[in-house]
Amino acid sequence: MRRLLTLTTLLAGVPLAAPVCAEQVFSFQRAAGQLPKTVVPVSYGINISTDIDNLKLTGQETIQVDVRTPTEDVTLNQAGLHLAGAVLDNGVKATITQDDAAETATLHFPAKVSKGAHTLVITYSGPILKTPNGIYVDDYTAPSGETKRMLVTQFEVADARRMFPGWDEPAFKATFQLNVTLPKEAVAVSNMPVTQSTPEGTSQKRVSFATTPRMSTYLLALVAGDMKSVQGQADGTPLAVYAPSGLEEQGEYALHASEKILPYYNNYFGVKYPLPQMDMVAIPGNYQAGAMENWGLLTYIDNVLLFDPPNSTPRTRELIYEVVAHEMAHQWSGDLVTMGWWDNIWLNEGFASWM
Ligand SMILES: [Zn+2]
């Protein structure tokens, strides 16, 4: 009683501030964003062919879409790509307009596309960058002294659109099935396990990955190069740390950290880690993000993942544990449950940091 009286007295004595409002429950239609929500992607089948010497990629993707409001225009994101063609349901060709400043492309069809399920096939090409965003190459000095080239992706916040045209906003969740043609000697990893690897010509191979769960575009990832791994498991989930060949043993500490952290999080969140594997990769050098929580393929700049007992300090060991725990927390906070728009990224980051 006294507390209530005290509060009443206090409230009577000060001008009332604006009421505190909880945010509304998420609704896809209300979620902020720049793309129209008339057409929504359901699944992407992405085929890319990479030329890492000439820094070019060509792609063809098949997107299953759900048309929610009949429309003649389908607008999606692209950045730096050239869309060569877009065909709906095996026949209807679109006229394509690109707005490079807005990072979009609009596919204009001769008649309204009806409500419901449709298939969109887009062919395109674009650059592979040398700067660490979108799909890019990372040139580094290998332990052998040779200069080597790694193919890396970094999509958060809005650079998935540099690898494939799509609805590159976090609320547009869909499944992804990725197929990549790359040098035959490269080891390639993505969010999901490899399902098939077949030779292409004399110097390349085509690697296919299993279909992801529904997720946001910014969490898709691909890394390929001269890598080796150390492997373990926890709670039935295979775990691995990949590093440039010759450095993989330095991934042991992070691997053992992940083996302790995964069962703890499975129990803490009450939802078992839902992907069939969790890989972590050390990117040598050219990786501005520091570390990134791509779902099932966590990427780190090498000095926050690799621990070399004779040369690394105890502080490095602590830092590795901290960063691994942070990125693994994102597998739930951010990846499984994602903010509708970037204004709520604090929730992703705040929770992962708190864990
Ligand atoms: Zn984070």
UniProtKB/Swiss-Prot annotation:
The gene is pepN. This is Aminopeptidase N. Belongs to the peptidase M1 family. One of its GO terms (biological process) is peptide catabolic process. Zn(2+) binds at H326, H330, E349. Its cofactor is Zn(2+). It is found in: Cytoplasm. Disulfide bonds: none annotated. GO terms for cellular component: cytoplasm; extracellular space; membrane. GO terms for molecular function: alanyl aminopeptidase activity; metalloaminopeptidase activity; peptide binding; zinc ion binding. It is an enzyme of class 3 (hydrolase). It holds the Pfam family Peptidase_M1. Aminopeptidase N is involved in the degradation of intracellular peptides generated by protein breakdown during normal growth as well as in response to nutrient starvation. Its EC number is 3.4.11.2. It catalyses: Release of an N-terminal amino acid, Xaa-|-Yaa- from a peptide, amide or arylamide. Xaa is preferably Ala, but may be most amino acids including Pro (slow action). When a terminal hydrophobic residue is followed by a prolyl residue, the two may be released as an intact Xaa-Pro dipeptide. Substrate binds at E156, G290, A291, M292, E293, N294, E349.
